[in-house]
Curated annotation (Swiss-Prot):
Residues 180-182 are annotated as: Interaction with tRNA. The lineage of its organism: Bacteria, Bacillati, Bacillota, Clostridia, Eubacteriales. The record marks H156, Q369 as: Interaction with tRNA. The gene is mnmA. This is tRNA-specific 2-thiouridylase MnmA. It is found in: Cytoplasm. Its EC number is 2.8.1.13. It holds the Pfam family tRNA_Me_trans. Keywords: ATP-binding, Cytoplasm, Disulfide bond, Nucleotide-binding, RNA-binding, Transferase, tRNA processing, tRNA-binding. It comes from Symbiobacterium thermophilum (strain DSM 24528 / JCM 14929 / IAM 14863 / T).
Amino acid sequence: MPAGRRYGRTRRATLYVTKEGGGRPVAKRVLMAMSGGVDSSVAAALLVEQGYEVIGVTMNTWTDDIPEEIQMNQHSGCCSLAAVEDARSVAHKLGIPYYVMNFQGQFARTVIDYFIEEYTRGRTPNPCIACNRYVKFSAFLEKAKQLECDYVATGHYAVIGQDDRFPGRWLLGKSADARKDQTYVLHNLTQEALAHTLFPVGHLQKSEVRALAAKYGFVTADKPDSQEICFVYDNDYGRFLKERAPEAIVPGPILNTRGEVIGQHQGLPLYTIGQRKGLGLTTPRPVYVVDLDVERNAVIVGEDEETYRGGLVASDLNWIAIPGLTFPRRCRAKIRRMAPEAECTIYPIGEDAVRVEFDRPQRAITPGQAVVFYDGDWVLGGGTIERAIN
């Protein structure tokens, strides 16, 4: 694929795969984040083929409390010893230097502590978004600058471009593989980060990535995608929260939407909006969590239709395709990574908040999750959901 091409349905932009174009000086040294998975393995190989000087790095972010047998499991997350060995194997095959760098302190402060705090506030966080914001495209980027690297690169499924109308404004676009697109968890990348980041596999289908890995003979070619949050190795959030913040796990009442007590919950952080399973209730019809009342330490449940809301308020905004929002704007929004995009109008509220009104009510709008706004294939920006509104 050429360094730049036209891309997108509603915004004229030039897509950069290598960033060796658009009047930019050719830059050669890249700090490549290698998780030990197939995507970052192929990303590193593509950069080597394109002539970059690639330095492979695995970020050690979390190994506390993870049993040795889990760390040695090749199907465990990116912090496992098996993942490090897989990344080292790929780097050796490519003939590039490889290091393991310790980011545990930064990760604990900005991801683990945030994860726990949000749950104790009755919210449902997305730790991958926090990790991208504060670790991969902040602390890791700073490390790259210290090593005199021009770029960082990852195996994320997304693309980077420049707006043809506003030279110098970097854009974040959807990947070629819609099922693997990761723009939702990348929406808070700054212009500085986008200008110094490469996503080498963003223009490929996942099947193409696996085929390339097999062609290169990588041990990661058939490795399954990581599903769990890296620091919750067994995917049991409840266990993790009980161990890390036992004082926040306080039983309380389950109320219906009329305010009647119909059961007892085991601790507010163990529940999320839209949840049906694990409520321990016997009711004539299925009920779902429709709200978490922190002040009363109560879980509010109702029927499925009561989980729908017509809008939301979001704050902590990061705009990418535009410098800011000063007037109402039509766009599409996504309230969860796997949720479909929904038509909406966004209205500014001061400098760092918006009100979002959906054309059709959306199910399980969840405080703490991100809402990301799209203009065709490109990310306008996004923020954190504060509350749902009718």
